[in-house]
C-alpha cells in the first residue's frame, strides 16, 4: 500500500465532535421546566426533519422568544459554559497526536462567539479556534468554509474538515474543495451515517483516536459503515 502524505491541516467541528451536548440540552430542559427526555426527543425529531434544533425549544414552550430566553439564562447565571467533563474522552490525546504529525490543528463550528471563548479556555492542543458567531456566517454556507481554509493556512485539498453532521459538515466541505472525515458519534453522526452526504467523506470513523491513527499511517480510504 502506498502511504499518502499527511494533510497539512485539520479543522474540527465542535458539538458532538469534540463536545458532548448532553448537559447543554439538560440545562435547557431544566430552565423550561420540561422533562429532559422530552426535550431530547424533540431535538432529535426536529433535526431529523431538517429543522434548526432551536425549534425544539419552541415546541416545548410555544411562543417563546429563544434569543430572549438565552439572554435571561445568561443573566441568571445559567448561560453557556463548557467544562472538561463535556469533552469526549479521546479529544485531548487525538488532537495532540495530530499536532505531533506536524498538522495544523484548528476548531471551527456553528457556535456563538462566547462558545469559542469557552473552547479556548479549555486549553486544548490546537492552533486556533473560531466560530460562526465570530465570522457572522454559519455552515453550510460556502463562506464559512472559505473562512475554514483561511484558518487552516493551507490549500483546500491539503485541509481536512471533521464533523458528525453530513449535510452541514461533509457535503459543503467537499463542495469547497476540502477533504472531509465523518465522525459516527452523537445523534446525527449515527442517524445519517448511511446517507449520500456521509458517503462523500474521505474518512469515516467511530472515534478521533481512529482518525489520528489513520492520519498517522497515511490511510486515505473511507471505512465501510456496517
Q: Predicted regions: what is each one?
A:
Residues 2-103, 112-116:
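N-terminal helical cap/lid subdomain that shapes the substrate entry/recognition surface
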Residues 1-10, 92, 96-226:
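Asp-based, Mg2+/Mn2+-dependent phosphohydrolase catalytic module
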Amino acid at each position: 500500500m502506498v502511504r499518502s502524505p499527511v494533510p497539512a491541516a485539520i479543522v474540527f467541528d465542535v458539538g458532538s465532535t469534540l463536545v458532548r451536548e448532553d448537559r447543554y440540552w439538560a440545562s435547557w430542559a431544566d430552565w423550561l421546566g420540561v422533562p429532559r427526555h422530552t426535550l431530547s426527543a424533540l431535538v432529535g425529531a426536529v433535526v431529523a426533519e431538517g429543522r434548526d434544533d432551536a425549534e425544539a425549544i419552541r415546541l416545548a414552550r410555544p411562543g417563546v422568544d429563544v434569543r430572549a430566553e438565552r439572554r435571561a439564562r445568561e443573566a441568571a447565571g445559567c448561560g453557556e459554559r463548557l467544562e472538561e467533563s463535556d469533552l469526549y474522552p479521546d479529544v485531548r490525546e487525538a488532537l495532540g497526536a495530530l499536532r505531533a504529525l506536524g498538522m495544523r490543528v484548528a476548531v471551527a463550528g456553528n457556535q456563538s462567539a462566547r462558545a469559542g471563548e469557552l473552547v479556548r479556555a479549555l486549553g486544548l492542543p490546537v492552533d486556533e479556534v473560531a466560530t460562526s458567531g465570530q465570522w457572522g456566517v454559519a455552515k453550510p454556507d460556502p463562506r464559512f468554509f472559505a473562512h475554514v481554509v483561511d484558518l487552516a493556512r493551507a490549500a483546500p485539498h491539503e485541509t481536512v474538515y471533521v464533523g458528525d453532521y453530513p449535510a452541514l459538515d461533509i457535503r459543503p466541505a467537499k463542495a469547497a474543495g476540502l477533504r472531509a472525515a465523518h465522525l459516527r458519534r452523537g445523534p446525527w453522526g449515527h442517524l445519517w451515517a448511511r446517507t449520500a452526504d456521509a458517503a462523500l467523506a474521505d474518512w469515516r470513523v467511530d472515534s478521533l483516536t481512529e482518525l489520528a491513527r489513520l492520519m498517522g499511517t497515511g490511510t486515505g480510504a473511507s471505512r465501510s459503515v456496517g
